[in-house]
Amino acid sequence: NSLIGPDFYWTAHPLDFLDDNDRARINVFDWQKEFSEIMEAGGFDTVIGNPPYIRIQVMQEWTPESVEYLKQKYRTAQSGNYDIYVVFVERGLSLLNKGGQLGFILPHKFFNAQYGEPLRRLIAKGKHLTEVVHFGHQQVFAGASTYTCLMFLDRTARDTFRFAKVDDLDQWRRVGTGDESEMPVTRVNSAEWAFSAGKGGTLLEKLGRITPKLEDVTDRIFQGLKTSADKIYIVEEKERRKDCVRIFSPEKQAEYWLEPDLLHPLVKGGDSKPYSLTRTNRLILFPYAKQTD
């Protein structure tokens, strides 16, 4: 196990308390001993791999001692429900020499998942990101539903990184091209990664500069609009005049005239289309007045 070193036995798990089966299952690996010349020279020039994709819950059932060790040893193992591949990235980085490079194929779920935040922070802080080749929904491995990317990291800090989006896997395999963009490394942070290439990348970056953002207005949104009585509060506009609106009430199956200040346009999820909203005559009754202190 390349993630677990001999210090596993020196701390909470002395050899005397583990039988042969336990030792074989945990299978510690001593990088300093097995690659002594390389490690004494500063580390590896290159680390290349396809780390395992295993949820920590599975490892907890199989080898809980290892899970506890990882939590104490690695920053990327601090989140509760992480996937083991994020720890392999941290370990791979630590094995590089000052000019070393890492290249992994791995799921891109950590770009947005909560458990990926420690790894995103680690990469952002060191400005390690060199290149991402994002396969989106394309299935690279036959017979396995995994959504992957190629990620390349440098041990030394970078000023820019390259992002490529692959929409046609067969074409990419033949000619190695896709939509590409060169981006400043300042785009990499511990928040969710939302990189985009080509014309879409320019638009996304422009939208990112627009303020205020929703996160600036509120910390969290736990639930959308809820009336608890839609048939009463959601009505249909029939006619509008300057000082009154004629509405139809589904609850009463009747029409009424109401003051415009009590009614507001209501948009539901199904009304939103790319770059536009479907016009509806749906209104919501809001019989309250907002007052300031």
For each feature predicted by the language model, list its residue ranges.
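SAM-dependent methyltransferase catalytic region
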Residues: 1-133, 137, 150-177
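C-terminal substrate-recognition regions of SAM-dependent nucleic acid methyltransferases
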Residues: 42, 95-97, 114, 139, ...
